[in-house]
Amino acid sequence: MTTTVGIVAKDGVVLATDKRVTAGYYIAHKAGEKIWKIDDHVAATMSGGVADLQSVLSFLSLRAREYRVEHKRPIPIRALVNYVSLLLFYSRPYIYLVHSIVGGVDAEEGPVLYMVDWLGTVTKEKYIATGSGSPYAKGALEVAYREDLTIDEAVELAIRAVKAAIRNDPGSGEGIDVVTITKSDGFRRVFTTQQKIIIPE
């Protein structure tokens, strides 16, 4: 149970998550990180089983590093998404219980966002929410999303979306993590102090 959000802005991609880690209805951790840097130009959020998440993320990070060494350039995001799709598809019947949002900026597609489900299905999205809080987050996204959002506007929208989930979903809570990925700055975390101002304790 969690909430993860991805948004494509005109100048980059925003990924946001809550910080609560649950095991059923038990709150296992209150400061979990659910956004992972794969390379300077791409990151992923995942919801699902922690052991499966760690395994899939290690494969993704390794593949990105291998590609950079072999080709002397960053891996195209679509290639990385195809890799995780095949990994999940061919793991059947012993599936990885993960639901992924992969987003970033590359030379081929610019700002781009993909969703990969636990069976390996890939969809390209302008905005997406996953996890138990996704119905509440999607409502906020659908009301306010525009294709001409700046990165700062997309950050504000992502925070509103996760905040809506935290208010209504018992599986989401404890604060918000936000990451931006742009061509100029690459992977960058939004500071915790900003999160505390937006979500007072």
UniProtKB/Swiss-Prot annotation:
<dbReference type="InterPro" id="IPR019983">
    <property type="entry name" value="Pept_T1A_Psome_bsu_arc"/>
</dbReference>
<keyword id="KW-0378">Hydrolase</keyword>
<dbReference type="InterPro" id="IPR029055">
    <property type="entry name" value="Ntn_hydrolases_N"/>
</dbReference>
<comment type="subunit">
    <text>The 20S proteasome core is composed of 14 alpha and 14 beta subunits that assemble into four stacked heptameric rings, resulting in a barrel-shaped structure. The two inner rings, each composed of seven catalytic beta subunits, are sandwiched by two outer rings, each composed of seven alpha subunits. The catalytic chamber with the active sites is on the inside of the barrel. Has a gated structure, the ends of the cylinder being occluded by the N-termini of the alpha-subunits. Is capped at one or both ends by the proteasome regulatory ATPase, PAN.</text>
</comment>
<dbReference type="GO" id="GO:0005737">
    <property type="term" value="C:cytoplasm"/>
</dbReference>
<keyword id="KW-0645">Protease</keyword>
<dbReference type="GO" id="GO:0010498">
    <property type="term" value="P:proteasomal protein catabolic process"/>
</dbReference>
<dbReference type="InterPro" id="IPR000243">
    <property type="entry name" value="Pept_T1A_subB"/>
</dbReference>
<keyword id="KW-0647">Proteasome</keyword>
<comment type="function">
    <text>Component of the proteasome core, a large protease complex with broad specificity involved in protein degradation.</text>
</comment>
<keyword id="KW-0068">Autocatalytic cleavage</keyword>
<feature type="propeptide" description="Removed in mature form; by autocatalysis">
    <location>
        <position position="1"/>
    </location>
</feature>
<keyword id="KW-0865">Zymogen</keyword>
<dbReference type="GO" id="GO:0019774">
    <property type="term" value="C:proteasome core complex, beta-subunit complex"/>
</dbReference>
<keyword id="KW-0888">Threonine protease</keyword>
<dbReference type="InterPro" id="IPR001353">
    <property type="entry name" value="Proteasome_sua/b"/>
</dbReference>
<dbReference type="GO" id="GO:0004298">
    <property type="term" value="F:threonine-type endopeptidase activity"/>
</dbReference>
<dbReference type="InterPro" id="IPR023333">
    <property type="entry name" value="Proteasome_suB-type"/>
</dbReference>
<feature type="active site" description="Nucleophile">
    <location>
        <position position="2"/>
    </location>
</feature>
<comment type="similarity">
    <text>Belongs to the peptidase T1B family.</text>
</comment>
<dbReference type="Pfam" id="PF00227">
    <property type="entry name" value="Proteasome"/>
</dbReference>
<dbReference type="InterPro" id="IPR016050">
    <property type="entry name" value="Proteasome_bsu_CS"/>
</dbReference>
<protein>
    <recommendedName>
        <fullName>Proteasome subunit beta 1</fullName>
        <ecNumber>3.4.25.1</ecNumber>
    </recommendedName>
</protein>
<keyword id="KW-0963">Cytoplasm</keyword>
